[in-house]
Structure formats: C-alpha cells, structure tokens
Amino acid sequence: MFDESYTIKNFDDVLFKAISDEKRRQEEHIELIASENYVSPRVLEAQGSVLTNKYAEGYPGKRYYGGCEFVDVAEELAISRAKLLFGAHYVNVQPHSGSQANAAVMMALLSPGDTFMGMALPHGGHLTHGSKVNFSGKLYHSVEYGVDNNTGLIDYDALEKLALQHKPKLIIAGFSAYSRILDWARFREIADKVGAYLMADIAHVAGLVAVGLYPSPVPYADVVTTTTHKTLRGPRGGLILCKENEEIEKKLNSAVFPGMQGGPLMHVIAAKAVAFAEALLPEFKTYQQQVLANARTMCSVLQSRGYDIVSGGTDNHLLLVDLINKGITGKEADAALGRANITVNKNSVPNDPRSPFVTSGLRLGTPAATTRGFKEREITLLSNWVADVLDNVHDETNISRVKTQVLLLCREFPVYA
C-alpha cells in the first residue's frame, strides 16, 4: 500500500530537482512562446488524480473494461462542456494531442496516397498539415498553399487555383504561426468547388473562438480539431469537434479508437473537463480580451522600435517578427532573449533563406504572460526589453540589465502565488 511518504522528493532526488528547477524557471522567466500557457491548480489536481490508474478503452457506456462508471462521468462532463463551449454537435475528447487529433481525422476521411492541401510550414502551417518529414506528408500526397509574398496574408485566389488543379479530397485551414483571421467561408467555398472535406485546425486560437473573439469554423468545416492547451489554457491534449453528420461522426470515433489509440488518458480527460468549465466562466472572456490587447500592444511597440511584423500586425494572440533586415538570426535572437529570462521560439518566416534550425524570425505570443496578470503597462515594458536585447544580441551588459528587470517583474506577478 502507499502512504504520504511516497514522494518524489524522498525517492528520486535527481528528478525532484529537475521538477523544482522547472518550477523556478517558470516563475523567474517570462513566457512568450505562443503555444504555451499556465494551467490552474484545479487542472493540475485533476491531472494528478487517481484517474491515472484506470483503463477505459471505448467510449462512455460502451467500454471494454469494467469499473468505468466514474471515469465515464468525467468524460461525459468533458464532452458536454466542450459542446457548449464551441457550439458543436459532436465532440471527441480522447485524442492525446493535437497531432493525434489531426491524424485521426485524416485516417477517417482519407486513404493512403490521397491528395490533401495544407498551409506550408515555412508560411505558418504545422507539421501535420503536410510537411514531408511528418506522417501527413509521408502517408498522403500533400499540396501546400501559402501567403502572398508582399502582404504576408493567405492568397485565397492562389489557393483556389491549386485546389482546382490538384482536386484534393481534404483541405486543412489552420496554422501555427499566422497572426490574422482565417476566412472560413472562403475556405468552404473553395472546398465545395472541388468536392473536398474542410478541416479547421484551431489549436492556436481555440480559447479566442470559445468566447467569440475569433470567428468559429464550426458552422463551415466538416471537422474541427484543436489542442486543449495554448489559448484554451487546459492540459496538453487534443479535441475533435464537428457539426451534425452521423457518417463523419462514426468515422471519427472509429479513427480515434481503435484506429489511432487504445486506452484514453482519463486523468487528462478529467483535466480537460475542468479547463472547459473554467472557459465557460465570464472571466475567461475577460482574459481572452486582454490576450488580444496585449498582442496588439506588443506588436505596436516592436514596430515603433523598427521591427518588421509579418502581415503588418496581428488579429490574434501571436505575432511573427521578421529579423531579415536586422541581420540577426532567429536562433541568435532566441538565445539572447533566453539569457535575459525571456522565453521565445525561433521561427521561419515566409520565404525564409535560412534553415528551420536557424531561421530568420521569432514567434511571440501573449497567452502565458496574460495569465500571469500582465496588462498593457507590463507588455509595453516587456516589449521594449525585447527590442533592447534584439538591438544588440551580443551586449551581455545590456542583457544582464534586462534580466534584472525581468526578475523584478516576475516577483511582482507570480504564476502560482
């Protein structure tokens, strides 16, 4: 039997130190990676619960194991709350990740070798949207669309021409580094012209969609996928949604289980249920409004400091900084900001001349900093510090000065008080 003395601290000091160090890093560094956020203690509690012990292959009421009556409650709560949150008829909360959700949709709607279209990774897409190094580009024939070289915006006319030329069976509308609003109706129109399914990947903007601050694709897309972290501020996991379509719903259920996965992670599903309940609260919309305000503020400050933003601005939680004209690489910028305790990620920009391991850009996002309590005042300070570091990535005295300021601000706004 187990008792309270069975702690990591008393058993594995190396691992305990790593966890403690990571907790300190999160408290002492400002997180600007657009895909990261901080979950509430309630989400942590659910994910660390005894539900981790339970195998539950199948779906609520139709399990292949006994003893699932209580984990069924958790999954049904997650499903019903997600339906309410997104206005969806069908929800599957079992995918372990956004990539698993995307893979399940492709398994449900495509056969190996079928043609589909997705946004090119260097233009802001995701690995699972057709990258040749990913399953999506290996199992299926992917055709990539991108952004206009001059505007940095999706070229819908060029996308339509590609669709008419290649006749894809599926079109993916979604991104990992695109700062503008997608025209779901235009995507639907293009998909209908070639008889394609339309899948919307809202992994980055799900929280904004949930509160009505970013247009919902649910009325337009055949299937919608998302992660449950990022702007949704839940545990790491995936989610599949769709409007009413019995045939597609059956295919999706079969693709997730038994097609892609065996037993679902019931402790994570419980944590999803908690996060969805939090997202249904009025304060979650207030939070998302601040995420947008902070992103606009950051964009404005960096532009005033002479930094180019791809597409010229942002309509969501992220912005892509183009460093080509500054003569520094994304890798150099990432490392320099890291030394100042500001965490970012290097990112390719459209038509980037450098490799994905080096890049010419930075992707910045405001969800985590906003969760911390930052508003326009703090974001203005922070954005100027970012520019101060980027102005001379080799000035260690200046980087040290910024780090000192960052630490003071972090103490003023702890993550877990």
Swiss-Prot record:
Swiss-Prot/TrEMBL catalytic activity: (6R)-5,10-methylene-5,6,7,8-tetrahydrofolate + glycine + H2O = (6S)-5,6,7,8-tetrahydrofolate + L-serine
What Pfam family is a match, any one? SHMT
Q: In which pathway does it act?
A: One-carbon metabolism; tetrahydrofolate interconversion; Amino-acid biosynthesis; glycine biosynthesis; glycine from L-serine: step 1/1
Q: Which UniProt keywords apply?
A: Amino-acid biosynthesis, Cytoplasm, One-carbon metabolism, Pyridoxal phosphate, Transferase
The residues that hold (6S)-5,6,7,8-tetrahydrofolate are: 121, 125-127, 355-357
Can you cite a GO biological process for this protein? Answer: glycine biosynthetic process from serine
* Location of N6-(pyridoxal phosphate)lysine modifications: 230
Q: Which Gene3D superfamilies has this protein been placed in? A: Aspartate Aminotransferase, domain 1, Type I PLP-dependent aspartate aminotransferase-like (Major domain)
Query: Could you confirm whether the keyword Calcium appears in this record?
Result: no
Q: State the InterPro entries in the record.
A: PyrdxlP-dep_Trfase, PyrdxlP-dep_Trfase_major, PyrdxlP-dep_Trfase_small, Ser_HO-MeTrfase, Ser_HO-MeTrfase-like, Ser_HO-MeTrfase_PLP_BS, SHMT-like_dom
Q: Where is this site: Plays an important role in substrate specificity?
A: 229
Q: Which domain of life is it from?
A: Bacteria
Q: What is its EC number?
A: 2.1.2.1
The keyword Amino-acid biosynthesis appears for this protein: yes
Of the GO CC terms on this record, one is: cytosol
Cofactor dependency: pyridoxal 5'-phosphate
A GO molecular function annotation here is: pyridoxal phosphate binding
Q: PANTHER family in the record, alphabetically?
A: SERINE HYDROXYMETHYLTRANSFERASE
Q: How does it assemble?
A: Homodimer.
By sequence similarity, the record places it as follows: Belongs to the SHMT family.
The free-text function statement in the UniProt record for this protein reads: Catalyzes the reversible interconversion of serine and glycine with tetrahydrofolate (THF) serving as the one-carbon carrier. This reaction serves as the major source of one-carbon groups required for the biosynthesis of purines, thymidylate, methionine, and other important biomolecules. Also exhibits THF-independent aldolase activity toward beta-hydroxyamino acids, producing glycine and aldehydes, via a retro-aldol mechanism.
State the name under which the record lists this protein.
Serine hydroxymethyltransferase
Q: To which species is this protein native?
A: Legionella pneumophila (strain Lens)
